[in-house]
């Protein structure tokens, strides 16, 4: 897909190139999360967007708005991610967003949310959900700390930082 070619020309990779060993090792895990994940791409992007929003990461949010559109999320759904889980989402999407929020705020998925997830996802998918949110929390910390600049053409949201 075009977004993958664009992603690898992104400012984040230029910054990470300052530490080639870190970049090489992180890419193995990040590649699983982004392209070998057992979660559907649309759902993966819901998780990443919510994580980016929760972490106040303009770069992560903007990059993944582009990717989210490419995998079928509408602009209305993307905006709704900023509001978090609500009854406007279907049960599966709401469970994903609740899990992302719990992982961000509590650093764990609560028992009730785990049961909700089990209604929609396999154990493998739940583990990939945790890995996705965890990876993008790390990425947001990196992006926010090193102040990686937005790439050209990536949407900015002034509500973030």
Regions found by a protein language model. Name each.
Residues 13-16, 26, 30-33, 46-52, ...:
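Short alpha-helical scaffolding segments that buttress acidic/His motifs in well-ordered protein cores
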Residues 25, 42-45, 60-63, 77, ...:
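Residue-level detector of well-ordered alpha-helical segments, enriched
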Residues 116-118, 142-161:
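Acidic, carboxylate-rich catalytic segments that either coordinate divalent cations
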Residues 39, 45, 51-71, 75:
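Conserved alpha-helical segments that form or flank metal/cofactor-binding pockets of metalloenzymes
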Residues 83, 92-130:
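Acidic/histidine-rich alpha-helical segments that form the ligand environment
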Residues 21-25, 56-61, 94-95, 103-111, ...:
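Short acidic alpha-helix initiation/capping motifs at coil-to-helix transition points
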Residues 1-7:
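Short, small-residue-biased leader/transition segments that mark boundaries at the very start
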């Amino acid at each position: 897909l075009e977004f993958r070619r664009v992603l690898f020309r992104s400012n984040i990779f230029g910054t990470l190139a300052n530490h080639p060993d870190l970049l090489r090792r992180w890419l193995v895990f990040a590649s699983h999360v982004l392209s070998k994940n057992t979660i559907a791409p649309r759902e993966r992007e819901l998780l990443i967007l919510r994580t980016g929003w929760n972490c106040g990461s303009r770069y992560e949010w903007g990059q993944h708005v582009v990717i989210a559109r490419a995998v079928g999320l509408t602009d209305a759904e993307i905006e709704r991610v900023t509001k978090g889980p609500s009854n406007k989402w279907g049960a599966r999407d709401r469970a994903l967003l609740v899990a992302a929020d719990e992982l961000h705020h509590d650093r764990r998925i609560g028992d009730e949310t785990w049961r909700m997830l089990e209604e929609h996802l396999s154990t493998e998918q739940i583990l990939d959900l945790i890995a996705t949110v965890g990876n993008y929390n790390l990425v947001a910390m990196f992006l926010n700390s090193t102040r990686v600049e937005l790439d050209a053409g990536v949407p900015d949201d002034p509500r973030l930082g």
